[in-house]
Amino acid sequence: MPAPTTEIEPIEAQSLKKLSLKSLKRSLELFSPVHGQFPPPDPEAKQIRLSHKMKVAFGGVEPVVSQPPRQPDRINEQPGPSNALSLAAPEGSKSTQKGATESAIVVGPTLLRPILPKGLNYTGSSGKSTTIIPANVSSYQRNLSTAALMERIPSRWPRPEWHAPWKNYRVIQGHLGWVRSVAFDPSNEWFCTGSADRTIKIWDVATGVLKLTLTGHIEQVRGLAVSNRHTYMFSAGDDKQVKCWDLEQNKVIRSYHGHLSGVYCLALHPTLDVLLTGGRDSVCRVWDIRTKMQIFALSGHDNTVCSVFTRPTDPQVVTGSHDTTIKFWDLRYGKTMSTLTHHKKSVRAMTLHPKENAFASASADNTKKFSLPKGEFCHNMLSQQKTIINAMAVNEDGVMVTGGDNGSIWFWDWKSGHSFQQSETIVQPGSLESEAGIYAACYDNTGSRLVTCEADKTIKMWKEDENATPETHPINFKPPKEIRRF
């Protein structure tokens, strides 16, 4: 028996043009301009939205009745206590015999009333002319109603201490290239400088006379540090080398190998035999001084590590980089503790205050102060040194100095962030005007002398002006109008 056949419905043949027109019509229905228009405004929804906004803004304040208060009957009613301050009147005057109600100034809560939009009137059940601010309202509503009573920022900003201006009293010449680094001896008898001429020179602090020249690097020397626990000096340069010098023999006794590119900064731990170096390979390396072994490779930056310091009290390392960040590292585990992203430009210089638990960092956008050990942001310096800042230092008296790439040297009051002196270095004869940059700065152990290393191949020494007084050099200080929290 043959299987039943099913009839297939004929499909109407459609031309390609008809199909394309059908698709075009469907697209117009979906994407026509009518669908992109907003619906007509709904008055009821608009009224609900306005009432909600008014409730949020003024819900914590009881409205004041716009009706005038009822005048009391002064003939039959005895005068009672009122919310008024009576003016003093001459003795025997008629006003004193009537309860002093006519010569009174009503002190109402008009200062605390919210400013209502034009055309909006509030009515309430209470007839008293007082403003009630509940304790459970939000801080925004409380600040809205008491903004006129808030204390102004300039009155709370610390006033800077007076500091004598600094002057250049000595220029030392001897290097054949840019002077890139400086470090002082713990005994405060000499200091050493590293230069682009690949030499390290040791100078007498009192006279500025050259005492010794050390050679060993094959590129410019960018970092120097003198140990206060050993007779060692450490140097780092663009030749990827970190060297330990014995100052009794005046020769290299150890070399630390591991950096993949130039080494830009160097620091010693104050209490441990640990050396910290940062370089162009974006890594801060921690070395054991005695065994020459690398303890940690603190990797996490995305660009050159150009500044580093550590503290004696906490196992903490702080690094600044060209990637605009400042990182806190735990020296016990070699891990990142936190990252500060306040700067917008390269953090080329940092300095630790010798007494306070705080440090400052300098960038081309601003100079900022942070607290330790958590790195909480304190404030910006009140002026902006509009240049690339390569060097900064601070002494125990609270005088911070920053040196720029254009030869500008600014002196700051640490507490308030006020710049009390803005100077320019003088390029020595034979140098170009563009060689007015400052690459390194360091105070001596007393904080009374400052050494700057500059691009005109000279070393300049600064000290305070002995003849300056607060009368001859007054403080020109204007407190900021607002506090920037970034």
UniProtKB/Swiss-Prot annotation:
One GO biological-process annotation of the entry reads: cotyledon development
Task: Give the residue ranges for region: Disordered.
Answer: 62-101, 465-486
Motif: DWD box 1; annotated at: 275-290
From the record, give the cysteines joined by S-S bonds.
none
Start and stop residues of the WD repeats: 174-204, 216-246, 258-288, 300-330, 342-371, 384-413, 433-463
Q: Does the keyword Nucleus apply?
A: yes
> Do you know which SMART domains this protein is assigned to?
WD40
Top-level taxon of origin = Eukaryota
Record's keyword terms, sorted: Immunity, Innate immunity, Nucleus, Plant defense, Repeat, Ubl conjugation pathway, WD repeat
CDD domains per the record? WD40
Instruction: Name where it's found.
Output: Nucleus
Q: How does it assemble?
A: Component of the multiprotein assembly MOS4-associated complex (MAC) at least composed of MOS4, CDC5, PRL1 and PRP19. Interacts with CDC5. Component of the CUL4-RBX1-DDB1-PRL1 E3 ubiquitin-protein ligase complex. Interacts with DDB1A through its DWD motif. Interacts with AKIN10, AKIN11 and PIPC. Interacts with KAP2.
Similarity comment: family membership: Belongs to the WD repeat PRL1/PRL2 family.
Give the protein's biological function: Pleiotropic regulator of glucose, stress and hormone responses. Also regulates cytochrome P450 CYP90A1/CPD. Coordinates the expression of hormone- and stress-related genes and genes related to cell wall modification and growth, leading to altered sugar-dependent growth and developmental responses. Component of the MAC complex that probably regulates defense responses through transcriptional control and thereby is essential for plant innate immunity.
- Entry's free-text remark on domains: The DWD box is required for interaction with DDB1A.
Q: What's the protein name?
A: Protein pleiotropic regulatory locus 1
Supply the source organism for this entry: Arabidopsis thaliana
Q: List the taxonomic lineage.
A: Eukaryota, Viridiplantae, Streptophyta, Embryophyta, Tracheophyta
Give the gene that encodes this protein: PRL1
